[in-house]
């Protein structure tokens, strides 16, 4: 029976299994599967767009012994920032690679409701503890 099912279905099932320890909210998983993955906010000052990974392309990573998921492929003007999911507190964090600054950003629902505000606030240092 398995041989008759589409391979993508099993790849997705395998990805879900791999990401189980990250405790991703269902809404976040669904968003990364359906998009839009390119977020645009032309009225913002610093960052006018960002591109998220699709669910199948989300990157597992470790930073200072913390297991995290990288959710953002790239964003406008700033290549040294990563948008990360932390399973520990079930929140988005960001990492400024150049300055080695790691700060909490928002819960997924808050972020996706106004991503331009959060990404620009991140650049301006609004969320630094």
Language-model-derived ranges and their functions:
Residues 79-81, 91-94:
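Substrate-binding/catalytic groove segments of enzymes
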Residues 86-89:
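Short acidic-glycine loop/turn motifs at beta-strand connectors
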């Amino acid at each position: 029976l398995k041989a008759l099912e589409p391979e993508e279905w099993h790849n997705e099932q395998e990805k879900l299994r791999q990401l189980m320890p990250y405790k991703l909210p269902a809404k976040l998983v669904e968003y990364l599967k359906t998009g839009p993955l390119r977020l645009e906010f032309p009225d913002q000052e610093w960052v006018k767009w960002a591109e998220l990974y699709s669910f199948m392309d989300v990157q597992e990573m470790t930073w200072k012994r913390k297991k995290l998921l990288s959710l953002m492929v790239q964003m406008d003007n700033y290549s040294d920032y990563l948008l990360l999911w932390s399973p520990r507190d079930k929140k988005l964090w960001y990492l400024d690679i150049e300055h080695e600054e790691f700060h909490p950003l928002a819960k997924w629902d808050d972020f996706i409701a106004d991503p331009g505000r959060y990404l620009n606030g991140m650049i301006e240092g609004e969320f630094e503890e």
